[in-house]
Structure formats: C-alpha cells, structure tokens
Amino acid sequence: MAEILVVDDDALIRNTLSELLSLQHKCQTAETAEIALAKLEADSFDVVLTDISMPGLSGLELLGHVLQKYPHTPVIIISGISDQDHAQGLIKLGAFDYLLKPFRLEVVEKSVMRAVEHRRRLQEGTTLDGDEAEAAAADDPTDWKIV
C-alpha cells in the first residue's frame, strides 16, 4: 500500500482527495507546504500531491524541496492555472504530472497510480517498456490543448 501526502490549503479539496486515495493507499494531509515538509521529514511518502498556490511556501517551492531531498518521490501538481506554458514549465522543473482544477477523481487516481509505479521502477532501477512508455507519453501534459 503506497503512502500518499496530499497538500492543499482548501479543506474540501484536501479531504476529497484524501478520502478517494485512502481507498487504495495510506494517506496523510497537510494544509501548508511547511506542514508537508515536516511530515516528509518524519515519514516516507511514495507520492506527493500538491496545490501550487498556497499561503506561505508555494507548491512550486515544495516541489523544489522534494526534488532536492527526495528525488525518487514523484510530485503531482494540482492547479487552477490552465496555461499550457505554466504546466510544461512545471513538468520541465521535475513535476511528475500537472492536473487542472476542477479535476475528475478518476484522473487523479490514474495519475497517482502511474506515479507509484514510476517510483517503484526508479527504486528498482528499471525503465518503462515500449507499450508503457507510449501510454505514459500519451498522458504527457505537453500534449495537452488547453482552451
């Protein structure tokens, strides 16, 4: 069972994601990036799911900390910013995925499952086979057409 950390200052979104992900994973929540960093120090997480715009440290700053200290931990960004350049920029910085608010729960679940598998493969030192790489590329936000 994967350990997921959900970070969002909006209690409704945070609790909705936690309830959804708790069906298949162990889930903890944090309402700020600062609380998330403390939880990351105390526990090991397989995936971090974070909002980008929060009071205090932003999700972008959290992404930087996670990439630096926990490079095998995928970070999924959830944001209301529908700018394709913004999404591509965060992916280039190292975010595993970029999901738009409002989001569909099945899309979040699929992204988390891919991130868990990605982390497992990184830890094992394996890579995606051809079919899996093609499927992952099909989900790449750089292919999105945001309107």
Pin down the residues of each PLM region.
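Receiver (REC) domain active-site loop signature in two-component systems and cognate sites
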Residues: 54
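Two-component/phosphorelay signaling modules centered on CheY-like receiver
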Residues: 11-28
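CheY-like receiver
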Residues: 117-147
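Active-site beta3 strand of CheY-like receiver
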Residues: 44-49
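C-terminal output helix
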Residues: 85, 103-112
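Acidic catalytic/metal-coordinating carboxylates
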Residues: 32-35, 58-61
